[in-house]
Amino acid sequence: MGGSLLSACGGGNLSDDSPATPRLASVDNFRDVAGAAPYPTVDGRQMRRGVFYRANALTLDTADHAAIDRLGIASVYDLRTPEESARTADSLPGGATTRTLNVLGTADFVVPAVDTAAAAVAFMETQARGYVTGAAQRAAYGALLTSLADGPGAQLFHSSAGKDRAGWIAALLLSIANVPLDVIMQDYLLSNVYLALWIKAQTDTLRQQGGDAAASVHAPLLSVQENYLQAGFDQVKASYGTMASYLTQGLGISQATINTLHSRLVV
């Protein structure tokens, strides 16, 4: 792939002197949206690190709390349902404000009852398409992008595992930054690397409870696959024609907001 989902919208030319993003043992899918390198754009520029971070639930231990505090995160956006947030409360970075944006619009996220791996894959693809078509999803993502554009300082958004709800908004930000499509997909799939120990632990538990069959059936729910993100992109094309139309018409954000995000995202 080599194209981008959204044409460039302008931006600054500041140098990237941000510190390396720490690996957090207690929040294993924590990372900089801009990547470790950082990511290149299709027009020869690169993303700016230290602006937006993504994560799974913020179950910070003492050492990781100290590490994340050094990043100066001013705002945290929790994309989970109320019941998810109640079960696993966030440990916020020092001085950060928090806002809940319930992407699913339901009281809780209920793991579906599936009896085949194919059914699990179908559920994940349907969920990805719902990020594009669902009213609650569009409202939450539109509000999040607006807040990310307007908010001062570094900002963090997270879901439970940090791979699906958070993975979609990260893909949107990379699209706004004009990152190549293959890089966007590679970034999406990195959740499988960052969450490897968690995936193994969940798989081992499923195997102990229901044998190899149960572990195999539920495996697609624990990880990300290229076809999940592609299902979302395909739905954008089917429903709105272009990513730009999805952002402005579907999510209700202005071109000025897109321009501001691009300026913040790209060096």
Positions of the model-derived regions?
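Cys-dependent protein tyrosine phosphatase-like superfamily
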Residues: 1-155, 169-267
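Histidine-centered active-site/metal-ligand motif
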Residues: 158
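Ser/Thr-glycine-rich phosphate-binding loops at phosphate-binding pockets of nucleotides
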Residues: 161, 165-166
